[in-house]
């Protein structure tokens, strides 16, 4: 049996943006916004920023069920965040969810508005 060398992490890790396939750009190892772009805001206090992914659908179903039950405070505006185009890295979205993941909810019924992100938290 031969001994293998122990792994030693690099002192400086460099991210190679070019590595990866079509969906490699939906995640990145750096924090913060990659570009300036404000998020749209509709007429309801709850603003949902999401996409039709399983986690995004969970929140939409929840809000639709609450609205169907007559809970007026659950009325919301939904906005598409196209993760394939990197919209989750916009300055507006990162202000709501610093993790740059969908879904994210912004509740304007409080001052300042309350940020809620990750489907389980919403």
Segments (PLM) and residue ranges:
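N-terminal G-site of the GST-like fold
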Residues: 1-120
């Amino acid at each position: 049996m031969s001994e293998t060398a122990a792994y030693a992490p690099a002192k400086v890790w460099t991210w190679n943006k070019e590595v990866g396939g079509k969906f490699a750009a939906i995640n990145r190892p750096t924090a913060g916004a990659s570009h300036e772009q404000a998020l749209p805001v509709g007429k309801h206090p709850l603003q949902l920023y999401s996409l039709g992914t399983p986690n995004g659908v969970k929140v939409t179903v929840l809000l639709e069920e609450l609205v169907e039950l007559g809970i007026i405070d659950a009325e919301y505006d939904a906005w598409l965040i196209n993760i394939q185009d990197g919209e989750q890295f916009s300055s507006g979205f990162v202000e709501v969810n610093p993790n740059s993941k969908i879904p994210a909810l912004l509740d304007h019924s409080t001052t300042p508005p309350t940020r809620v992100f990750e489907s389980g938290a919403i």
